[in-house]
């Protein structure tokens, strides 16, 4: 197992997202998504990839666990699914993102930055 986490940062403050990925040599990924003005642990998602029932590609099942009152699990699930489908591995993501008084547009930007960080990671693996 590679003990070095790979770190990717996307976006401008206060909407910066950092993705840290720990690889296990093809046996799963563990990732931590933080950002905004107050990184923390707010939610966890586990994505398990599997073949689609129609045989046309890959899908995944995503389980979620959130800290009460936190919505970070939505970012965790989004990133876990994208990583699982991109890497064809089981993925566990912990997320904690906070921006004071974030608007709907601010939250959308944070989510887009999280997906962009996943894209940067996946492209680094190509």
Can you annotate each of these PLM segments?
Residues 1, 124-126:
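Generic structural signal for short, solvent-exposed loop/turn connectors between secondary structure elements
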Residues 1-7:
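Extended amphipathic alpha-helical scaffolds
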Residues 9-86, 90-100, 106-114, 120-124:
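Conserved mixed alpha/beta catalytic, RNA-binding, or beta-rich assembly cores of soluble enzyme
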């Amino acid at each position: 197992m590679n003990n070095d986490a790979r770190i990717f940062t996307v976006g401008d403050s206060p909407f910066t997202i950092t993705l840290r990925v720990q690889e296990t040599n093809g046996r799963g990924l563990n990732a931590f998504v933080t950002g905004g003005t107050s990184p923390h642990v707010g939610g966890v998602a586990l994505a398990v990839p599997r073949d689609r029932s129609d045989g046309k590609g890959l899908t995944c099942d995503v389980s979620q666990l959130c800290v009460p009152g936190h919505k970070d699990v939505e970012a965790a699930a989004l990133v876990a699914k994208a990583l699982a489908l991109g890497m064809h591995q089981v993925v566990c993501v912990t997320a904690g993102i906070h921006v004071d008084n974030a608007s709907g547009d601010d939250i959308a930007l944070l989510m887009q930055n999280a997906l962009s960080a996943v894209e940067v990671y996946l492209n680094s693996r190509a």
